[in-house]
């Protein structure tokens, strides 16, 4: 799910998913 994907990215980057996607 999108929430789980966001959590994974959060753990990997330590930042907000929005920052990772550059949205």
From Swiss-Prot:
GO annotation, cellular component aspect: extracellular region
Keywords, comma-separated and alphabetical: Disulfide bond, Myotoxin, Secreted, Toxin
First-listed, main subcellular location of the protein, grouped into a coarse class: secreted
Compartments where found: Secreted
MF terms in GO: toxin activity
Tissue expression summary: Expressed by the venom gland.
Disulfide bond keyword on record: yes
Keyword Secreted among UniProt keywords: yes
Record-stated family: Belongs to the phospholipase A2 family. Group II subfamily.
Main function: Snake venom phospholipase A2 homolog that lacks catalytic activity. Shows myotoxic activities. Induces local edema a few hours after injection (5-10 ug) in the hind paw.
Official protein name in the record: Basic phospholipase A2 homolog CTs-K49c
Species of origin: Trimeresurus stejnegeri (Chinese green tree viper)
């Amino acid at each position: 799910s999108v929430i789980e994907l966001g959590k994974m990215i959060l753990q990997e980057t330590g930042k907000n998913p929005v920052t990772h996607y550059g949205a």
